[in-house]
């Protein structure tokens, strides 16, 4: 099958781009083209040139991106103007970079910056332990952990900011605080009653109870002042036989 060449009556053996390029670059084809335009006249030749140019331009736009709908094509929606919403369910276009409405330092293209980045506020600081500074603890906060080897119910945990400068510590042995340990002995149990406790306090080991006779004497016998106390004597041999 033969194919007619461009602007001439020469038939080609193949309708391919390489064959047509080889034919159009030949000397016979160029001579035939010149004779063709001379025969049709200047006005008709200009109209033919314009129609060919427009067809090539339309084919070039369609071949560059055939999946993209050009504005004004059938079935294509025109882009919404700035400040007006688009189709239902479609996000409005972001303001261009540098136009009013865009924050200073915003990235181009309407991208959302990460928190803490340029154009966004920094991360909020974490809340302090135990509520705000100097205030009560926030609802739902856990109590602070107790110190190691600290008896429960004696000294409360200090506030978050520490004790005030004019805070006075109670003297040793006061109610609710253990007495100082005796040198050479381990930690002893507190003998002072706690706040609200009633009754006679229990003395430490080796000391008599309040109101009891001294060690070695029976109850009800109290020597007069100035008389030395006699230690309790063990029974003799004569008394053991009786």
Curated annotation (Swiss-Prot):
Subcellular localization(s) per the UniProt record: Nucleus
Disordered: annotated segments: 60-242
A Pfam cross-reference name: zf-U1
Ranges annotated as biased composition (Pro residues): 90-107, 136-149, 156-183, 201-213
Keywords associated with the record: Metal-binding, Nucleus, Ribonucleoprotein, RNA-binding, Zinc, Zinc-finger
UniProt xrefs under HAMAP family: U1_C
Family of this protein: Belongs to the U1 small nuclear ribonucleoprotein C family.
Self-association state and partner proteins as the record states: U1 snRNP is composed of the 7 core Sm proteins B/B', D1, D2, D3, E, F and G that assemble in a heptameric protein ring on the Sm site of the small nuclear RNA to form the core snRNP, and at least 3 U1 snRNP-specific proteins U1-70K, U1-A and U1-C. U1-C interacts with U1 snRNA and the 5' splice-site region of the pre-mRNA.
Protein name as annotated: U1 small nuclear ribonucleoprotein C
